[in-house]
Swiss-Prot record:
Pfam families: GTP_EFTU, GTP_EFTU_D2, GTP_EFTU_D3. It catalyses: GTP + H2O = GDP + phosphate + H(+). GTP hydrolase that promotes the GTP-dependent binding of aminoacyl-tRNA to the A-site of ribosomes during protein biosynthesis. Residues 19-26 are annotated as: G1. PANTHER family: ELONGATION FACTOR TU, MITOCHONDRIAL, ELONGATION FACTOR TU-RELATED. InterPro entries: EF-Tu_GTP-bd, EF-Tu_GTPase, EFTu-like_2, EFTU_2, G_TR_CS, P-loop_NTPase, Small_GTP-bd, T_Tr_GTP-bd_dom. This is Elongation factor Tu-1. It comes from Streptomyces coelicolor (strain ATCC BAA-471 / A3(2) / M145).
Length: 397
């Protein structure tokens, strides 16, 4: 069966849900698809909770893509929405997921107010450069006292300001995702109001379409009879079918190949552009030739490196960071784009140790090469938990 072509008539914006576990991120995601389907049935499909909760790709391909993607449209825009799992051990996906957002819907239960993971997700949103946040004050149907709602809203605004988001100006919309999902008209309207706020408060992103093509690989799988497909979000540039690309990073040698097909939401494209989540079919490439963490680039536009200088912020104990300082030759993982690479840290002259909560300069030597340029951001992690964040300031080798 031929695939429908993807229509690119409306502005395309990537958003997602973030926030504490059980505050209703996935329920809200499902409610948005239902309410928009009811309002504009010709341009929206409804996605059921369990379909999103289990990430449908997982079941279809027998491989784990651990972030659920749904798409929907308002009158003004086409949205691709990622639902990030809430647990701390999914923070890796929070990092890859949040990196895919032009803006985020921060879900806070009115019954609880901001909780530790709310804080952690806002901090991560700040670190990975999520530029705009809209707040959904969920479960508002369960709070009778207007004053409590106001207090919770104030707390959320203060939290956002603390992490350098414009807390006073961020839209806060009271919703009940569950009631909206159950078909309650009034609470359904609250979800439409939320999406109106998203339309207005999350600007259309400036796309990097004019820069040379680059896409970090998130996943690799084989489609029987067609070959190897890699998926990811195009970070910048434009890629047309039948163009030549290099695959670099992680391995010592680069691989050169031709892209024979580009897909988005199971529809075929002639080209993929910055900001879009796509699958690329690669000619003559085996499943084991490529891996998550590598990047696909316009040939020669970026080079892999192992030694760099960086400015980093080390999380305080209260932010979920280390409880003790680290010293020279500290060996954490550096999380670049979609993968962890171990590196050895050299501290500046005269710095004996770095305390949780400090900013520091550092030199890093990685055990595997990473495609990098100045300004590239990374997280510093230990055993799966984020303990710092930084940016490459200079490449040495």
């Amino acid at each position: 069966m031929a695939k429908a072509k993807f229509e690119r008539t409306k502005p395309h914006v990537n958003i997602g849900t973030i926030g504490h576990i059980d505050h209703g991120k996935t329920t809200l995601t499902a409610a948005i698809t239902k309410v928009l389907h009811d309002a504009y049935p010709d341009i929206n499909e409804a996605s059921a909770f369990d379909q999103i909760d289990k990430a449908p790709e997982e079941r279809q391909r027998g491989i784990t893509i651990s972030i659920a993607h749904v798409e929907y449209q308002t009158e003004a825009r086409h949205y691709a929405h990622v639902d990030c799992p809430g647990h701390a051990d999914y923070i890796k996906n929070m990092i890859t997921g949040a990196a895919q957002m032009d803006g985020a819907i921060l879900v806070v239960a009115a019954t609880d107010g901001p909780m530790p993971q709310t804080k952690e997700h806002v901090l991560l949103a700040r670190q990975v450069g999520v530029p705009y946040i809209v707040v959904a004050l969920n479960k508002a149907d369960m709070v009778d006292d207007e004053e409590i709602l106001e207090l919770v809203e104030l707390e959320v605004r203060e939290l956002l300001s603390e992490y350098e988001f414009p807390g006073d100006d961020v839209p806060v919309v009271k919703v009940s995702a569950l009631k909206a999902l159950e078909g309650d008209k009034e609470w359904g309207n609250s979800v439409l109001e939320l999406m109106k706020a998203v339309d207005e408060a999350i600007p259309e992103p400036e796309r990097d379409v004019d820069k040379p093509f680059l896409m970090p690989i998130e996943d690799v799988f084989t489609i029987t009879g067609r070959g190897t497909v890699v998926t990811g979000r195009i970070e910048r540039g434009v890629l047309k079918v039948n163009e030549t690309v290099d695959i670099i990073g992680i391995k010592t040698e680069k691989t050169t190949t031709t892209v024979t097909g580009i897909e988005m939401f199971r529809k075929l494209l002639d080209e993929g552009q910055a900001g879009e989540n796509v699958g690329l079919l690669l000619r003559g490439i085996k499943r084991e030739d490529v891996e998550r963490g590598q990047v696909i680039i316009k040939p020669g536009s970026v080079t892999p490196h192992t030694e760099f200088e960086a400015q980093a912020y080390i999380l305080s104990k209260d932010e979920g960071g280390r409880h003790t300082p680290f010293f020279n030759n500290y060996r954490p993982q550096f999380y670049f784009r979609t993968t962890d690479v171990t590196g050895v840290v050299t501290l500046p002259e005269g710095t004996e140790m770095v305390m949780p909560g400090d900013n520091t300069e550092m030199k890093v030597e990685l055990i595997q090469p990473v495609a990098m340029e100045e300004g590239l951001k990374f997280a510093i992690r230990e055993g799966g938990r984020t303990v710092g964040a930084g940016q490459v300031t200079k490449i040495n080798k």
